[in-house]
Amino acid sequence: MFGDLASPFVLVLGLGESGLAMARWCARHGARARVADTREAPANLPALRAHVPDAEFIGGPFAPSLLEGVALVAISPGLSPLDAAVAALLDGARERAVPVWGEIELFARALAGLKLAQGYAPRVLAITGTNGKTTTTALAGALVQRAGKTVGVAGNISPSALDKLTECVDAGTLPDVWVLELSSFQLETTHTLDADAATILNITQDHLDWHGSMAAYAAAKGRIFGAGTVRVLNRQDADVMAFAGKRGGDVTFGTDEPATPEALGLLRDGGIPWIVLAEADDDDLPKPARRKKGDTTPAAPVPVRLKRLMPADALRIRGLHNATNAMAALALCRAIGLPASALLHGLRDYAGEPHRVELIAAFDDIEFFDDSKGTNVGATVAALSGLSKRVVLIAGGDGKGQDFSPLAAPVAQYARAVVLIGRDAPRIRAALADSGVELVEAATLEAAVQEAAARAQAGDAVLLSPACASFDMFRNYEHRAQVFHEAVAALAADRGVML
């Protein structure tokens, strides 16, 4: 389970969900664990004491002495390598030739160990991207199940991959397929994962405070592809297409018409957008001449015919961005040979995930959407463009150092007004100053709902899509969503509508 390391002494950094899972996993497989957290009494400390009673816990600022006697560092995804104390420990580990793994690396090595011990060889699908990861992961898991396979869905989506694997091992129910949602944080310390198929949905500015630069952020995303992985790529995102394989065999998706075999896209016919598959139409073409060794001339393009799969409007999840998520999930499942008919039925049945452009109420001919999970600019751009109607947007919070200027064009095109909340409201206001849209600031989310509803007209939507993290005003994005739901319910009650 630990490669060449036999029962190593492991330093686990961070005691969040992943840190606790790594400590439990290491102890289960004979390793001694030292667990360190910058908090003196993290919330998971009682669980660590209960499940790993022999673990050594050290709370407080990280110190170089944590590395004494350690053969492996297992680092939690929330800890940035740019943090001075974390960086010092990682430098110390490198100087001592101590490997640094994250939870997904431990998971990948666990699968390799199970293959050697039991012949267990599941298919693995992996999903990353700035936005849409959770929806695509949950949808891919539902499609796998609809196709008659057992499935384990884990990773960034929760539960942790190691906890889910432990549960399956103990129950004797190891799944046919693993579907993993992977964040850039998790991928940063992943080295040997070789998924059967993987996708990068999109790459837009996010987590620059953690990675330091867009180049570093994108590079972390690219670690999702192993040597044998089928790459499922958003062909309309140049940063994603930079990871196209040199030998071909990639599968692409997008909201345009596909032009290469196996690609997915949209065909608009009579005002109806259809999800279509490009199939090779080479029946009448002459057999290509044998290519000489070293010939780098690009192969002639293969003509395609477009096969209609289903109207995009038949999806229960709203917006063009969700159509692309659906195409990515479909492409991943097709890459491991699952039957198309079952997959298409699964696409029609999937109802979506909470807090992701979720319709929570409709009254007075106005719809209210909760996109509290939209914690970056790219997510809000996708939500605005995907609803295809006039929107009063509620945005703001902790901007994590993002550039808000990409909001200006979609706000000008789709928004009737923008109500701003939170710490970075002034920065968003400055970015939208020339959009020609009314900009209003509110002290609380409850007040923002009132301001937004007062400006919405019949047929409009009020959209909470903050483009920011929530921690300046709320415990987390779920708490922000809860406050939004309660404020919308109170507004409805004031207007004589019970939700």
Swiss-Prot record:
Tagged with keyword Ligase: yes
SUPFAM superfamilies assigned to the protein according to its UniProt record, in alphabetical order: MurCD N-terminal domain, MurD-like peptide ligases, catalytic domain, MurD-like peptide ligases, peptide-binding domain
Pathway the protein acts in: Cell wall biogenesis; peptidoglycan biosynthesis
Assigned EC number: 6.3.2.9
Binding site for ATP: 129-135
Catalytic EC class: ligase
Predominant localisation class: cytoplasm
Protein name in UniProt: UDP-N-acetylmuramoylalanine--D-glutamate ligase
Source organism: Ralstonia nicotianae (strain ATCC BAA-1114 / GMI1000)
Gene: murD
